[in-house]
Amino acid sequence: MSDDFKINDATYSGTKEVDQNLKFDTNLLQDWMHEYIPNCESISSVEQFKGGQSNPTYKILTKTGAYVLRRKPPGKLLPKAHAVDREYKVISALEETDVPVPKTFGLCDDHDVVGTPFFMMEFVEGKVFWDHLLPSCSKTERAQIYRDKNRVIAALHGVDYSSVGLAVSYTHLTLPTRLPV
């Protein structure tokens, strides 16, 4: 791989101060959190994750825990783009399966809270690898990571999507019963 295309994990990992155009009133979020997250204490800090391209993602710290907020970006968007509601539905549905996902706390479509629809989930400590070749890992670490990835893929394949509420209907794709000759 050319050095021009190497991805530096540190560049995209971790958090930063929230971009000015993505800030929101933490008092309104705090009120929402008190309603949806049991025993939630006051927000002590809000940071924005560095990585990602689509939906702004924040680390919310309180005295009792760390949470992640994913929201639609502000501004004019394509109708089906940035579907945080779909992300929430899938993650929530997988909570009771063998697929490791964070616990979700709620989906909010009230624009008055943070300006756009969002959902909250627990923060899970870990490392994000932006380069799939895992150059910062030893051979042993890479082998373990790939085994874990395969285990999770197998767990996904084992999910009965209908029973967890993720069945998809394709009735809108039916072909005409009579084709022109």
What are these model-derived regions, one by one?
Residues 37-44, 179:
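Secondary-structure boundary/capping signal
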Residues 2-7, 31, 65, 123, ...:
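Membrane-targeting and insertion segments and their boundary/processing signals
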Residues 3-38:
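Juxta-kinase regulatory segment immediately upstream of eukaryotic protein kinase catalytic domains
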Residues 44-173:
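ATP-binding pocket architecture of kinase catalytic cores
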Residues 172-181:
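Single conserved hydrophobic/aromatic residue that forms the stacking wall/gate
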